Regions:
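Helical (often loop-to-helix) elements that flank the catalytic cores of nucleotide-handling enzymes
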Residues: 83-109
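Long, charge-dense
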Residues: 101-123
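Signature for HUH/AEP ssDNA processing cores
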Residues: 1-75, 84-88, 108, 120-186
């Protein structure tokens, strides 16, 4: 879990319909979630939490470009911030990848995204996996990296799930073996 910097608060609150009201809300309660219209300063791609957490980890470990990332624990979704009007680039590169894309929602014009306050606490519904620290630097590779890692992450999770179905867990195998030995001895 991360916290926003002062410059991150300035950038994100500027995207609010009422920037001063947003800053006042967060000054009063820095944990308070706030709803923003997507499409003006940023777009957001949301995916299932399992795929999103794996994609976040892959982007981070590989040093690929990506912006703020939010987790909605109740909805079990992860949202990746992209520059506004990135939908064509994102969709194009998603279609270019070899695997099937995971189900996702692209939030842009006429969409609203709820984000955590600057200082969420453990257990809050909304968390920053990567909080905004300043106005994100425009990077045309951000939607490309996200599209690539979402497909790779979805494929990895599908393979892990398939493996788990085909081969029982070590604990189940050990327990099964133990029960057979006990039965054989008695």
């Amino acid at each position: 879990m991360q916290r926003m910097t002062t410059r991150g608060v300035e950038w994100l609150s500027a995207a609010a319909d009422d920037p001063a009201g947003c800053r006042a809300t967060w000054a009063d309660d820095p944990r308070a979630p706030y709803a923003f219209a997507a499409g003006r300063f940023f777009d957001v791609v949301t995916v299932d939490q399992r795929v999103g957490m794996e994609a976040f980890d892959q982007l981070l470990r590989r040093g690929l470009p990506f912006g703020p990332v939010v987790l909605d624990q109740k909805a079990r979704r992860v949202g990746f911030f992209l520059g506004s009007r990135s939908d064509e680039t994102f969709s194009h590169h998603l279609a270019q990848e070899a695997g099937a894309p995971p189900p996702y929602r692209y939030l842009s014009q006429s969409s609203v995204v709820v984000v955590p306050g600057p200082m969420p606490m453990t257990g809050d519904r909304y968390q920053w996996l990567r909080a905004p620290t300043r106005r994100p630097i425009a990077n045309p590779l951000r939607p490309v990296a996200l599209a690539t890692m979402l497909i790779a992450s979805a494929e990895l999770i599908a393979r892990v799930d398939s493996y788990s179905e085909r081969y029982p867990s070590a604990a189940a195998f050990a327990l099964g073996g133990f029960e057979r030995r006990t039965t054989d001895a008695g």
